[in-house]
Amino acid sequence: MKLSPGKKAPDEVNVLIEIPLGSNIKYEYDEEEEVVKVDRILYTSMVYPFNYGFIPGTLEEDGDPLDVLVISNYPLLPGTAIEVRPIGILYMRDEEGEDAKIIAVPKDKVDPTFSNIKDIIDLPQAIKDKINHFFEHYKELEPGKWVKISGWGGVSEAKTRINEAIKRANSK
């Protein structure tokens, strides 16, 4: 993939959208074939509360790129890229290990709606509750799968995680 993490990373990063807001289909980008594929349809009667994707040119310890939930009022097509500002991180584990999610908003030039959101503490509690609820329950009906949320981190923790994931990818 030619898309980089972003020229201003970690302050502004590129996110490749895999799953649009409102979707109950889990899409995943297949790096070898360079296409977005259907991974599965969610077993629960839930939909993704916001757009979901990853930062290209990053690598987590589990071998996957760093996941991002993009807070937005509009669904974005799978396979599109958007420039975002990280505002925090959701710490969680699933059946495969640690699986943190960066929480981000579109950069102001893309969508000024969230220009006043600079850190996770600025995000309304109702939005954080919606995110928590989704990730706590979206795998419940899938055999052998589970999720445990351990808390939130602020913008500085998110940026540190992004820098670590970029360094890990570059040293690979």
Curated annotation (Swiss-Prot):
Cofactor: Mg(2+)
Biological processes annotated in GO: phosphate-containing compound metabolic process
One cellular component (GO) term of this entry: cytoplasm
List of residues binding Mg(2+) 2: 67
Ligand binding (substrate): 26, 40, 52, 138
Xref: Pfam families: Pyrophosphatase
UniProt-listed Enzyme Commission number(s): 3.6.1.1
Top-level taxonomic group: Archaea
Recorded GO MF terms: inorganic diphosphate phosphatase activity; magnesium ion binding
Major site of localization recorded for this protein: cytoplasm
PANTHER family, A to Z: INORGANIC PYROPHOSPHATASE
NCBIfam families: PRK01250.1 (NF002317)
Protein role: Catalyzes the hydrolysis of inorganic pyrophosphate (PPi) forming two phosphate ions.
Family, per entry: Belongs to the PPase family.
Name used for this protein in its record: Inorganic pyrophosphatase
Species of origin: Sulfurisphaera tokodaii (strain DSM 16993 / JCM 10545 / NBRC 100140 / 7) (Sulfolobus tokodaii)
Phylogenetic placement of the source organism: Archaea, Thermoproteota, Thermoprotei, Sulfolobales, Sulfolobaceae
Gene: ppa
